[in-house]
UniProtKB/Swiss-Prot annotation:
TPR repeats lie at residues 6-39, 40-73, 157-196, 272-305, 307-339, 386-419, 420-453, 455-492, 493-527, 564-597, 598-631, 632-665, 633-665, 673-713, 790-824, 826-860, 861-894, 980-1013, 1020-1053, 1055-1084, 1325-1358, 1399-1432. It holds the Pfam family TPR_16. It comes from Mus musculus (Mouse). Keywords: Acetylation, Cytoplasm, Nucleus, Repeat, TPR repeat. One of its GO terms (cellular component) is cytosol. PANTHER family: SUPERKILLER 3 PROTEIN-RELATED, SUPERKILLER COMPLEX PROTEIN 3. It comes from the Eukaryota. The modification N-acetylserine is found at S2. The keyword Acetylation applies. One of its GO terms (biological process) is nuclear-transcribed mRNA catabolic process, 3'-5' exonucleolytic nonsense-mediated decay. This is Superkiller complex protein 3. The keyword Cytoplasm applies. It is found in: Cytoplasm; Nucleus. Component of the SKI complex, a multiprotein complex that assists the RNA-degrading exosome during the mRNA decay and quality-control pathways. The SKI complex catalyzes mRNA extraction from 80S ribosomal complexes in the 3'-5' direction and channels mRNA to the cytosolic exosome for degradation. SKI-mediated extraction of mRNA from stalled ribosomes allow binding of the Pelota-HBS1L complex and subsequent ribosome disassembly by ABCE1 for ribosome recycling. In the nucleus, the SKI complex associates with transcriptionally active genes in a manner dependent on PAF1 complex (PAF1C).
Amino acid sequence: MSSKEVKTALKSARDAIRNKEYKEALKHCKTVLKQEKNNYNAWVFIGVAAAELEQPDQAQGAYKKAAELEPEQLLAWQGLASLYEKCNQVNAKDDLPGVYQKLLDLYESADRQKWCDVCKKLVALYHQEKKHLEVARTWHRLIKTRQEDGADRQELYELWRKLSQLLAENIEDQNNETQQMLLTAFENALDLADNIPSEDHQVLYRNFIQCLSKFPHETTKLKKACEEMIAIYPTVQYPLEVICLYLIDSGSLTSEGHQYCCKLVEMNSKSGPGLIGLGIIALQDKKYEDAVRHLTEGLKESPVCIAGWCHLAEAQVKMHRPKEAILSCNQALKTIDNFGASGGNLHQKNLCLRLKAEALLKLSDGASSEEAVRTLDQVSDVDNTPGLLVLQGLACLNTGAVDKATKIMEDLVTSYPDLAEAHALEGRVHFTKKDYVQAEVSFQRALEKDAEVAEYHYQLGLTYWFMGEETRKDKTKALTHFLKAARLDAHMGKVFCYLGHYYRDVAGDRNRARGCYRKAFELDDNDAESGAAAVDLSLELEDTETALAILTAVTQKASAGAAKWAWLRRGLYHLKAGQHSQAVADLQAALRADPKDCNCWESLGEAYLSRGGYTTALKSFMKASELNPDSTYSVFKVAAIQQILGRYSEAIAQYQLIIKMKEDYVPALKGLGECHLLLGKVALVDFLDGKAVDYVEQALGYFTRALQHRADVSCLWKLVGDACTCLHPVSPSKVHVHVLGALLGQKEGQEVLKKEELLSLGGRCYGRALKLMSTSNTWCDLGINYYRQVQHLAETGSSMSDLTELLEKSLHCLKKAVRLDSNNHLHWNALGVVACYRGVGNYALAQHCFIKSIQAEQINAAAWTNLGVLYLATENIEQAHEAFKMAQSLDPSYLLCWIGQALIAERVGSYDTMDLFRHTTELSMHTEGAIGYAYWVCTTLQDKSNRETELYQYNILEMNAIPAAQGVLCKYVERIQNSASAFTMLGYLNEHLQLKKEAAEAYQRATTLLHSAEDQNTYNVAVRNWGRLLCSIGDYDRAIQAFKSTPLVELEDIIGFALALFMKGLYKESGSAYERALAVCKSEQDKAHILTAMAIVEYKQGKMDAAKSFLFKCSILKEPTAESLQALCALGLAMRDATLSKAALNELLKHIKRRNDYHSCLLMSAIYALQGHSVAVQRQVAKAVHSNPADPALWSLLSRIVAQYTQRSAKGGAVAGNVAHILDLNHGKKALLYTAVNQLAMGSSTAEDKSNTALKTIQKAAFLSPDDPAVWAGLMAACHADDKLALLNNTQPKRVDLYLALRSAVAASLKDKEILQNYNQSLEKWSFSQVVTGLIDTGKTSEAESLCTQSLKSNPDQPAVILLLRQVQCMSLLESQKPLPDAVLEELQKTVMSNSTSVPAWQWLAQVYQSQGMMGAAEMCYRKSLQVASQQGNWSGKLSSLLKLALLALEVCMANVSGDHWSSLVQEATSEALKVCFSPLAVFLQALLQFNRKMGARETRRLLERIVYQTGYPSSIVSAARWYLLRHLYAKDDPELIDVLVRNAETHGDKRILELNRKLSAQ
């Protein structure tokens, strides 16, 4: 290609680029390059086209190639620069500065404007990359070029200003050359500025000063710049702030600096630098308050001023505010750490650390001193600075390191003998060692070196304060130095504290002392000692306002748990002022500060007590007592509060603790006496008179001991009088009180006082109290005492003349009490009561007194009641009713007004009488209310005709009247023991409650009281009642004697006598007595009863015909009684004459309304049982239950019948027993036993139900009926069954050692039970067999054998015991697995034959034969047991025999013995068992037979799956069936069914099957 063609191609390429046909341009360029490889323009065009086509690498290569070819040509470099500017690649940015430099070189001579543009681009690039030096140099070159080009002043100003802006960032990272160029830029810009002053110029100056402030070496320029700016802009704060901060940091605040600060503060009162500067100047002038104020305010505005914090800390240390100083130092150190450690900062840091250590040492506590040591360790070059070594020594002293402090002190004194601080430290060391003489010398040396240090004077004064005896007496030296210290340092609070001590304790000037203490506290509000002393002295000087002001000021700013002294004192102040709630709050705050201050707890207790918070006060005093067990006061207050709260026993225990510490502590003795007296009064209210007497006796003992120490205390004598008088209601026979001789005027010993003597002693003690202090209350108590003496003498039969003098004395005393205090309603009331007494009978005076009492106290139920009694006594019924009604309205719970209303109702014959008396007994116990209620209950009970009335239902049944009346009457006779009618009523009520022994005792007491009475008929009735009850409780001899003591003419006496003879076993005499009664008897019904009784007497003598004859006579009477027909029916049963029994029962059913009642049902069932109809027995009772479902007796009977006759319905029997127990507890006691027996009869199915086991049921029965031998026997059976079940479940039996204990319980329960001897003997035999069986099962054969042998020794003729003995003896032989000799087998056979009616005996013999391999003999024995069970109707025996027979045959089958006999026997026995009842075991045995015949047969699987998957089978049988089914399935190789079976086993937790599955699957 020719050169012309090349030019044409290049032209085409240029045109293509212009037309944006870049690819076309590339083609042309490539064409050119094929001809001329080094064509510059072609390479440039390729670069342009590639760049436009976004192919930067190709473009870069092309431009570089072009630049290489012609480096002095611009096009390639311009293209490369443009490419790099657009490209974001890292290497492009790295290469761009070089490209710009090349362009600068090319443009410098060619185009100055473009040179400037490239230069600015290059600077921007350098600035972006933070190449500050290159920025400075390049921009400086630009300025120089523009200067050469003749740029104007404004342009140059802008260029220098721009340079200052470019370099002002990141000054800290710049080198010295760059920084100098920056300053030059600012200076030139300022010089070239035209608009002065102006906003831009001000900003520029501000930036210049800000820049200078960052250059520590340019302080001169900084100061100059600030001064210049201040001159130009006098109202601008910034330069002033900068120069102030500079002067502050440099520590060169002169008068000039002071002017700057003042000017700054004038311009802005909140200027931080200005205030800090003023604070530092104030500190230099020792104006510490101003310094702290200015510095604190300044640092709020300028918190990063390290020098400010340091100076603030220094000022605070000078003002003895160590805690504040520590905070300031910490803030300074934090700021230093944030700004980094330069040389200046290091100095400031050391200064801060020193100040912090000094402040910490002023706190004086160990923790602060330890921190001071750690702080000093951070100071550099501490070992070479004496001042720091002194601080280190003081820190060691405060932490207890005296030896180390001594070493530091000695080194300092040696190295710096002229250093005052060293000698002061020496003095401190000696002072700590209590070597005050040497301390004095050292402090004097320190003062010689520097006499103007307040601390040295204070320490010397302190040394004199604690020095020897002379100085202690004369503290003038101490005072002198304290005063000098106070003069030198007016902020040293502790010196003013000791000045306060001096003026208070030595000079006795309390006003001046208070002033010193207040000054000390003002200086240091943490000085609790000074504050407390100031408050205490203010209170002593009666300046409560000042004291309260101090306390309030402290408590308001105190944090939680602080200022205990202030809270405590303010609390005590409020307590004294009666402001109890505020006192409580303050004392609680004090306790938050010190929870272990027992005094504080005591004060809080007093505060609670003052506002009536007894419980909280009690807790407070108890806490105080815990903290200080030796504090008598705390324990006493605990006891006193418990006494107030009515916790007398606890109070007594506390008082006893005090008496152990101080035997003669009279308040505790008095408290003990009061508590026992109060307990006695409580016992009197509860009618526990014996207890009351004992408590009063103890109270008198304590009061006497107190009087031995303080006989001059009136209240003690009054309390003795109260104790003697309070027993007035107690029966004289119970009052025998031991009184110490000291109370009776004797020197030693004690006497027993009766009631009369005790009341008289009470009167004398009241008199003694009146001699010491005459009060209206004591006069009233004395008057009441005389009145009680009169009452007692009247009860004992004294004549009225003997009582007159005492009554006059009583009236005189009560009138005296009224005169002394006419507004006391109790005095008027007491006077009215005495005026009513029959020996006085002054009703007008009594009425006047009661009215005066009401006037004195409007709410006065007692006075209204007494007024009502007065009206009732005078037959004014309506007025009495109104008075009682008024009393009721005032106090509905006041008992006596209700008794008054009840008496009125009784008098007028109201139906509400009984209800009112009942209400009185519900309110409280009172003799009148009790006897009234008991009388009306007995009266209602005696009326047999009202049983169906609503009145009877409500008053007797619903209100539970009988036990309620019996309860109150018991209390009545406890106190009033001479009322025969009360004892008779009590006996009658006890009879109704089946409390026969108690009834007999009550009747006996009535008989004794009536023995000498004139009314012989009443006496005979009492004896009759007594005899009847003696007979009921089995005391027949005394019953016979009682009835013999009567004339025996009344029918009731004769039949009672006859019954007693009968029960004693004297049947002939009893029969004669009944004949005598029959002769006297007039009523047909009574005759029938007597004939029935005579028939029973004949029956007892074995005269059946005579008995039948008497009963037939009864039946032919006009009105035969149900009892006689029942007796005839029972006689038929006893004679086993079903026809007679049935005829009698049919006749009986004609005469009774309810055919299905318990007795008729029992008789009918007995007849069916006699006829052998077991199912009919159950049906009869079930029918009766259906007719009377609410009768618990019938449900109980049904449960018993099922257990005895139809065990197959045991589940129903258990349910019936539970129903009986729910309906009625009395029947339910026995029903629980029947329930348990039925549960046992149900077998293991109930045992698997953990919530309903026979064992739990029988345990409940034993708890409710511990005297029933059958219950203990049942418990033995339940334990045995539980142990068997445990073995079945492969667990350890729990009750293996209970059998002998339970047999002992059975034997103990059978003692003295003469009724049903045959039943008892059978029970005892069964229990014996059960014990032996249990011992055999648990492996205790030797004990079982010993038990059997002992039983046979006492009675050899016991076939059952012999059988048990042979079973025990055979155990060891069978365990040896040796064949038994024929002789042994023959002996065993004989033993079983002697027990041929025993099913278990034949089964046991069969098991013996089976163990010997004698299967035929075993089969014969099982068949024999089956025969015996069938003959006896023994359902369970029959079932067990069949199952055991089937098991025997199956064992033979599984031994693969040939023949069909045994397999057919299995089938036959199990089929018969299933006919008896559904038996899971029988079904399982059939399945096993099939498994043995054809293991893999489908029938085998069907039978086993029925057991495994159907419900109703016990878990043990199901588990065994799973075992065989799994073997069957593996034999059939059926994995699907195997998985189903394994899942079933997992669900039921059958581990045995899972283990078998693992073994079979591994084979």
